[in-house]
């Protein structure tokens, strides 16, 4: 990864492990350590489950602490949005999201087994994820309006399917058949992966449109 900081210096960054910033104590401990390593940028997870533990109520404590400690150490921050997916799975989504399978449906394998992966074909999944991400971006625009500390934002993390090459849930099958995908593109894992890549991209690209508040 290469980008330019406001001082026109190349990024020399280090990425925290998945759950290394889940508390104020974690952040207080890790930021000085990153500075001692000679880094100028830290890639830090932004956890949806900790930011919106109750639907519609946002807690930016960890975000604020990350930025304040980074500033104290002279570090820049790249936030990684652990939203609907992280390494394919929906493990960092909030409990209220994960427990309401009817409202936020899961992807399924070819045998109809529900996977621990929110379906990207669900409008409810999209709206909930986007609402939280938009709240985070609005907060950052107020806390760091000139992007002097937060220099980048990664949208989702390693999205894709595990166990099954594509989603076989009812919503996904409807899209698959409507496009006559098998007829036009063939079958098999490669074709299935291309199908999913298209719809994951469509999911993320739709974020260009501002959500209804």
Region roles according to the model:
Residues 22-27, 58-62, 126-134:
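Glycine-rich anion/phosphate-binding loops
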Residues 1-40:
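N-terminal carbohydrate-binding accessory modules
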Residues 93, 100-213:
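Polysaccharide-binding and catalytic clefts of secreted carbohydrate-active enzymes
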Residues 5-7, 35, 39, 62-85, ...:
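Substrate-binding cleft of carbohydrate-active enzyme catalytic domains
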Residues 20, 53-56, 197:
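A generic secondary-structure micro-motif detector
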Residues 11-13, 41-43, 74-78, 148-154:
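Structural preference for beta-strand elements that scaffold enzyme active sites
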Residues 26-104, 203-212:
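Aromatic-lined substrate-binding rim segments of carbohydrate-active enzymes
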Residues 17-19, 47, 82-86, 155-160:
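Active-site beta-loop-alpha junctions enriched in small/polar residues
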């Amino acid at each position: 990864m290469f980008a330019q900081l406001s001082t026109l210096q190349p990024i020399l960054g280090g990425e925290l492990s998945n759950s290394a910033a889940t508390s104020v104590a974690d952040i207080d401990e890790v930021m000085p350590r990153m500075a001692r390593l000679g880094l100028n940028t830290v890639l830090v997870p932004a956890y949806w489950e900790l930011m919106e533990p109750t639907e519609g109520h946002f807690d930016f404590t960890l975000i604020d602490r990350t930025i304040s400690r980074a500033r104290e150490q002279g570090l820049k921050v790249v936030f990684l949005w652990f939203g609907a997916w992280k390494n394919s799975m929906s493990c960092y989504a909030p409990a209220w999201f994960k427990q309401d399978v009817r409202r936020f449906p899961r992807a399924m394998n070819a045998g109809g087994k529900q996977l621990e992966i929110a379906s990207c074909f669900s409008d409810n999944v999209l709206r909930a994820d986007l609402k939280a991400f938009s709240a985070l971006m609005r907060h950052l625009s107020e806390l760091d309006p000139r992007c002097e500390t937060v220099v980048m934002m990664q949208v989702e993390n390693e999205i894709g399917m595990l166990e099954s090459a594509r989603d076989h849930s009812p919503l996904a099958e409807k899209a698959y058949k409507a496009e006559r995908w098998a007829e036009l593109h063939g079958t098999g894992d490669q074709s299935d992966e291309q199908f999913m890549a298209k719809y994951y991209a469509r999911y993320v690209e739709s974020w260009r449109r501002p959500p209804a508040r």
